[in-house]
Each structure stands twice: as structure tokens, then as C-alpha cells.
């Protein structure tokens, strides 16, 4: 199965343009499926993939309390894999063609209030003033994620040449290998300048290549490290929800809309293929308006 998964991974990367994060999730789902298959029908290989077996696998995860959004992704992983396997001649019929994708409940994302975002960014800036290159980098991670609303995988994938410092623009490669240009403001520019002039030169090695953000050993920063940076920074803010990079992305989108930004402009900045995805943030702002109204209006 390992050889098959390696081929499928190459297909996801080269033909579908899937990110490393997505590919890792898909392969993890398939390894879970194959382990389930080996337990139920040892030695059957891909031929053991049937619609009832796939439904049993999903049902086992559902019974274990797996979130509906995760079940939806696992279903998508399997459907993508089996369709590919049919085209490759690895299996005859597609057992997942009639497998229903569970609809994920669309919940309002946790976001920072604007004052909480300011406190988190000020804490990161204060920590960087000592000149430690990792602290300088961490300030840039938090500042740039909030300033631009880009995904953490997009941030960590940036090269130095993807930054136009004169016009304060990022050239971002998003999902499906779609490229977009995203502006950033003066605070992010200050954090970037400090990193390029002080932090990055202190960490760079022969292995750094063109990567903009580096880890402690000089290699390209891993998104998991960036997530840790965000969690640690935000956790120091009193009363703030426990959020990671995606929470900063949610916060940036929400605060843009609260400031009067056009929905389609926010869609372009975030790299959403569907306006419906961006519209989720309008519900956050409406929910906040309702909460303020209920608290402040004498006849609420």
C-alpha cells in the first residue's frame, strides 16, 4: 500500500495542486482506512474496498466522536482516492461513487476582539525588542498572519523574492496553485524589515535556500512551529479565545468587514474560491452586533 500511497501523493501534488497540509491529511485518512480494511478483511488489498465497508469505516469514526467536518474530509479523501485508483486501473468499479459526504455544520469561528488582537501583537513586538532572532521571527509570524489573513501554509511557503517591500505586497501561492497579491500595512512592514535585517541573517545557513521564514536550525519554518508561536502569543492575552493561525485569519477577515471592507475584496484577499465561504464572516459581525445591542440597548 505504501507504493500506491506514494503515487497518489504525487498525483495530489502535481496534478491537483494540493498543499502539503491537505496531502498529509488525505494520506492519514487513507492509512486509517487501510488499517480498518486489514482488520476486517485481512489480505484483500484494494479489492476489499466496498461501499458497505467504507460506510462501516465512517460509522466507526462517527461512533468514536469524530467531528462531522472531519468525517466530511475523510469521505472526500476516499472519493478522490478511489476515483484515481479506477483511472489507474488499480480497481474495477468505484466503491465510493455513491458514498455520501456528511455535511459539516457551519459553526461561527472563534475570533479575537480588536483590542485582543492589538494586545497580542504588542506582546509579540515587546518580546522582539531584546533582539533574539527567534523572537523577531515570531513577531513577524503573528503580525503578518493578522495583517494579511493568509493561511499559515501560505506564510511558511513564502520565499524572500515573494515580498515586494517597496510596495508592501506579498505574492502568495494558495490552494490549487492559484497565485494572488496581498497587501500588508506599516506594522507588518516594520516586523518584516527587522526580520530581514536582523533575525534572518542570524539564523540563515547553507540549507536555508530562498525561504523567507526560518526555524531555529536555519531551514524553512514548519507550519506546526508557526501554530505553536500563535497559540503561545495569544494565550498570554487575558480573556482571549484559544486560537491558532486560522483563528488569526478569521479575526483579520472579521475586522476587515467590521471596518467596512467590501465582501468581494475580502474574498480576493483570503483566496476563497467561493463567496459563500467568505460570507461566513458576515455572520460573525452580525452576531457581535446582536450581542452589543442586547447588552447596551434599553429595549433589547
From Swiss-Prot:
Entry's transmembrane regions: none
Pfam families named in the record: Phage_int_SAM_1, Phage_integrase
GO cellular component, one term: cytoplasm
PROSITE patterns assigned: CB, TYR_RECOMBINASE
Classification via NCBIfam families: PRK00283.1 (NF001399)
UniProt similarity note: Belongs to the 'phage' integrase family. XerC subfamily.
The protein, known as: Tyrosine recombinase XerC
Species annotation: Mycolicibacterium gilvum (strain PYR-GCK) (Mycobacterium gilvum (strain PYR-GCK))
Gene, per the UniProt record: xerC
Amino acid at each position: 500500500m505504501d507504493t500506491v500511497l506514494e503515487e497518489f501523493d504525487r498525483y495530489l501534488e502535481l496534478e491537483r495542486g494540493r498543499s502539503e497540509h491537505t496531502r498529509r491529511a488525505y494520506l492519514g485518512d487513507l492509512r486509517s482506512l487501510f488499517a480498518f480494511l486489514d482488520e476486517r478483511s485481512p489480505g484483500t488489498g484494494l479489492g476489499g474496498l466496498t461501499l458497505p465497508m467504507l460506510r462501516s469505516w465512517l460509522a466507526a469514526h462517527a461512533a468514536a466522536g469524530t467531528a462531522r467536518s472531519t468525517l466530511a474530509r475523510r469521505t472526500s479523501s476516499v472519493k478522490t482516492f478511489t476515483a484515481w485508483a479506477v483511472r489507474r486501473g488499480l480497481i474495477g468499479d468505484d466503491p465510493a461513487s455513491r458514498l455520501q459526504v456528511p455535511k459539516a455544520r457551519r459553526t461561527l469561528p472563534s475570533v479575537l476582539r480588536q483590542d485582543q488582537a492589538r494586545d497580542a501583537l504588542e506582546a509579540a513586538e515587546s518580546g522582539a525588542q531584546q533582539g533574539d532572532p527567534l523572537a523577531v521571527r515570531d513577531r513577524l509570524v503573528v503580525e503578518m498572519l493578522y495583517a494579511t489573513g493568509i493561511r499559515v501554509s501560505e506564510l511558511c511557503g513564502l520565499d524572500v523574492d515573494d515580498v515586494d517591500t517597496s510596495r508592501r505586497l506579498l505574492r502568495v501561492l494558495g490552494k490549487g496553485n492559484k497565485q494572488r497579491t496581498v497587501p500588508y500595512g506599516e506594522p507588518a512592514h516594520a516586523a518584516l524589515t527587522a526580520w530581514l535585517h536582523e533575525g534572518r541573517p542570524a539564523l540563515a545557513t547553507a540549507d536555508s535556500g530562498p525561504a523567507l521564514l526560518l526555524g531555529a536550525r536555519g531551514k524553512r519554518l514548519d507550519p506546526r512551529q508557526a501554530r505553536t508561536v500563535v497559540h503561545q502569543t495569544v494565550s498570554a492575552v487575558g480573556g482571549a479565545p484559544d486560537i491558532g493561525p486560522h483563528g488569526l485569519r478569521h479575526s483579520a477577515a472579521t475586522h476587515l468587514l467590521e471596518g467596512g471592507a467590501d465582501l468581494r475584496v475580502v474574498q480576493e484577499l483570503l483566496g476563497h474560491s467561493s463567496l459563500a465561504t467568505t460570507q461566513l464572516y458576515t455572520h460573525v459581525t452580525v452576531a457581535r452586533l446582536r450581542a452589543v445591542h442586547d447588552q447596551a440597548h434599553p429595549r433589547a
